[in-house]
Amino acid sequence: MSLARILLVLALAAAPAGAQEGQFLSEAEAPHAVFPDADSVSRSAFEVTPALRDAVSARLEGTRASVWESQWIVFRAQHGTELLGHAVVVEEIGKHRPITFVVGLRPDGRVADVAVMAYREPYGGEIRSARFLSQYHDKGPADAVRPYRDIRNVAGATLSVEAASRAVKKAQALAAVLGLTS
Protein backbone atom coordinates (compact mmCIF):
# COMPACT_ATOMS: atom_id res chain seq x y z
CA MET A 1 0.00 0.00 0.00
CA SER A 2 1.39 3.42 -0.92
CA LEU A 3 2.20 6.05 1.70
CA ALA A 4 -0.49 8.36 0.27
CA ARG A 5 -3.11 5.64 0.64
CA ILE A 6 -2.05 4.89 4.23
CA LEU A 7 -2.23 8.59 5.12
CA LEU A 8 -5.68 8.86 3.54
CA VAL A 9 -6.96 5.85 5.53
CA LEU A 10 -5.54 7.30 8.77
CA ALA A 11 -7.05 10.72 8.06
CA LEU A 12 -10.48 9.22 7.37
CA ALA A 13 -10.31 7.08 10.51
CA ALA A 14 -9.48 10.11 12.64
CA ALA A 15 -12.24 12.30 11.15
CA PRO A 16 -15.62 12.65 12.86
CA ALA A 17 -18.23 10.12 11.74
CA GLY A 18 -20.29 12.75 9.93
CA ALA A 19 -21.57 16.25 10.09
CA GLN A 20 -23.67 16.38 13.23
CA GLU A 21 -23.74 20.15 13.68
CA GLY A 22 -26.05 22.45 11.80
CA GLN A 23 -29.08 24.70 11.61
CA PHE A 24 -31.91 22.41 10.54
CA LEU A 25 -35.00 24.58 10.92
CA SER A 26 -35.42 28.32 10.68
CA GLU A 27 -37.62 30.09 13.19
CA ALA A 28 -40.32 30.40 10.51
CA GLU A 29 -40.19 26.65 9.76
CA ALA A 30 -40.20 25.56 13.41
CA PRO A 31 -43.94 25.74 14.23
CA HIS A 32 -44.81 23.88 11.01
CA ALA A 33 -42.34 21.12 11.88
CA VAL A 34 -44.31 20.27 15.03
CA PHE A 35 -47.77 21.27 13.77
CA PRO A 36 -47.77 20.35 10.05
CA ASP A 37 -51.55 20.88 9.78
CA ALA A 38 -51.35 24.49 10.95
CA ASP A 39 -52.56 26.97 8.36
CA SER A 40 -51.82 29.97 10.55
CA VAL A 41 -49.25 30.70 13.23
CA SER A 42 -48.66 33.78 15.32
CA ARG A 43 -45.39 34.52 17.06
CA SER A 44 -44.91 35.93 20.56
CA ALA A 45 -41.65 36.71 22.31
CA PHE A 46 -41.51 36.59 26.10
CA GLU A 47 -38.67 38.43 27.80
CA VAL A 48 -37.37 36.36 30.69
CA THR A 49 -37.95 38.53 33.74
CA PRO A 50 -36.78 37.42 37.19
CA ALA A 51 -40.40 36.61 38.10
CA LEU A 52 -40.92 34.49 34.96
CA ARG A 53 -37.56 32.75 35.47
CA ASP A 54 -38.46 31.93 39.10
CA ALA A 55 -41.93 30.63 38.18
CA VAL A 56 -40.58 28.36 35.43
CA SER A 57 -37.67 27.21 37.63
CA ALA A 58 -40.10 26.30 40.41
CA ARG A 59 -42.01 24.02 38.03
CA LEU A 60 -38.74 22.44 36.88
CA GLU A 61 -37.52 21.52 40.34
CA GLY A 62 -35.72 18.18 40.20
CA THR A 63 -35.35 18.11 36.40
CA ARG A 64 -31.91 19.76 36.12
CA ALA A 65 -33.25 21.91 33.28
CA SER A 66 -31.54 25.26 32.89
CA VAL A 67 -33.34 28.57 32.67
CA TRP A 68 -30.75 30.82 31.10
CA GLU A 69 -32.35 32.21 27.94
CA SER A 70 -33.03 35.96 27.76
CA GLN A 71 -36.30 35.39 25.89
CA TRP A 72 -38.56 32.57 24.77
CA ILE A 73 -40.34 32.40 21.44
CA VAL A 74 -43.80 30.82 21.40
CA PHE A 75 -45.99 30.25 18.33
CA ARG A 76 -49.75 29.78 18.50
CA ALA A 77 -50.67 27.19 15.83
CA GLN A 78 -54.17 27.00 14.38
CA HIS A 79 -56.02 25.14 11.66
CA GLY A 80 -58.89 27.39 10.70
CA THR A 81 -60.42 28.42 14.02
CA GLU A 82 -59.19 25.31 15.86
CA LEU A 83 -56.26 25.80 18.22
CA LEU A 84 -53.79 22.99 17.56
CA GLY A 85 -51.44 24.12 20.31
CA HIS A 86 -48.28 26.11 20.91
CA ALA A 87 -44.78 25.60 19.52
CA VAL A 88 -42.23 26.60 22.17
CA VAL A 89 -38.60 27.28 21.24
CA VAL A 90 -36.17 26.39 24.04
CA GLU A 91 -32.47 25.67 24.40
CA GLU A 92 -30.66 23.19 26.58
CA ILE A 93 -26.97 22.49 26.89
CA GLY A 94 -25.75 19.23 25.34
CA LYS A 95 -22.23 18.21 26.26
CA HIS A 96 -20.67 21.62 25.68
CA ARG A 97 -23.01 23.75 23.57
CA PRO A 98 -26.70 24.65 23.40
CA ILE A 99 -29.14 22.60 21.36
CA THR A 100 -32.19 24.50 20.10
CA PHE A 101 -35.48 22.58 20.17
CA VAL A 102 -39.03 23.39 19.17
CA VAL A 103 -41.59 21.54 21.28
CA GLY A 104 -45.18 21.36 20.05
CA LEU A 105 -47.65 21.26 22.93
CA ARG A 106 -51.35 20.56 22.54
CA PRO A 107 -53.79 22.67 24.59
CA ASP A 108 -53.81 19.99 27.32
CA GLY A 109 -50.01 20.32 27.70
CA ARG A 110 -49.20 16.98 26.10
CA VAL A 111 -46.43 16.82 23.50
CA ALA A 112 -47.61 16.85 19.89
CA ASP A 113 -44.09 16.67 18.45
CA VAL A 114 -40.48 17.73 19.02
CA ALA A 115 -37.86 18.84 16.49
CA VAL A 116 -34.24 19.93 16.67
CA MET A 117 -33.77 23.39 15.16
CA ALA A 118 -30.01 23.71 15.72
CA TYR A 119 -27.44 21.19 16.87
CA ARG A 120 -23.99 22.48 17.79
CA GLU A 121 -22.14 19.39 19.02
CA PRO A 122 -19.79 17.25 16.93
CA TYR A 123 -21.45 14.01 18.13
CA GLY A 124 -24.90 12.89 19.18
CA GLY A 125 -26.89 14.41 16.34
CA GLU A 126 -28.83 11.14 16.06
CA ILE A 127 -31.33 12.66 18.48
CA ARG A 128 -32.73 14.50 15.43
CA SER A 129 -34.21 11.25 14.13
CA ALA A 130 -37.98 10.89 14.05
CA ARG A 131 -37.60 7.47 15.68
CA PHE A 132 -35.93 9.00 18.74
CA LEU A 133 -38.09 12.13 19.00
CA SER A 134 -41.35 10.17 18.62
CA GLN A 135 -40.78 8.80 22.13
CA TYR A 136 -41.91 12.18 23.50
CA HIS A 137 -45.26 12.13 21.66
CA ASP A 138 -48.19 12.36 24.04
CA LYS A 139 -46.02 12.87 27.14
CA GLY A 140 -47.82 15.14 29.58
CA PRO A 141 -46.42 17.50 32.19
CA ALA A 142 -46.75 14.83 34.90
CA ASP A 143 -45.12 12.09 32.80
CA ALA A 144 -41.48 11.21 33.41
CA VAL A 145 -39.06 11.46 30.49
CA ARG A 146 -35.92 9.98 32.03
CA PRO A 147 -33.29 8.54 29.70
CA TYR A 148 -32.76 4.77 30.12
CA ARG A 149 -36.11 4.48 31.93
CA ASP A 150 -38.88 6.29 30.04
CA ILE A 151 -36.91 7.28 26.94
CA ARG A 152 -34.60 4.94 25.04
CA ASN A 153 -31.11 6.33 24.94
CA VAL A 154 -29.03 6.83 21.80
CA ALA A 155 -25.55 5.29 22.02
CA GLY A 156 -22.96 8.04 22.11
CA ALA A 157 -25.55 10.76 22.67
CA THR A 158 -26.45 10.41 26.35
CA LEU A 159 -26.01 14.11 27.15
CA SER A 160 -27.99 15.13 24.08
CA VAL A 161 -30.80 12.75 25.07
CA GLU A 162 -30.83 14.29 28.54
CA ALA A 163 -30.94 17.76 26.95
CA ALA A 164 -33.95 16.76 24.84
CA SER A 165 -35.80 15.52 27.92
CA ARG A 166 -35.01 18.71 29.83
CA ALA A 167 -36.15 20.81 26.85
CA VAL A 168 -39.53 19.06 26.77
CA LYS A 169 -40.03 19.65 30.50
CA LYS A 170 -38.91 23.29 30.19
CA ALA A 171 -41.38 23.91 27.34
CA GLN A 172 -44.20 22.34 29.35
CA ALA A 173 -43.32 24.40 32.43
CA LEU A 174 -43.17 27.64 30.44
CA ALA A 175 -46.50 26.96 28.72
CA ALA A 176 -48.15 26.25 32.07
CA VAL A 177 -46.73 29.41 33.68
CA LEU A 178 -47.91 31.50 30.71
CA GLY A 179 -51.37 29.93 30.92
CA LEU A 180 -51.14 28.41 27.44
CA THR A 181 -52.04 24.87 28.54
CA SER A 182 -54.59 23.42 30.91
Residue ranges of model-derived segments:
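Bacterial N-terminal signal peptides
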Residues: 4-15
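Flexible, solvent-exposed loop/hinge segments and secondary-structure transition points
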Residues: 19-154, 158, 162, 166-182
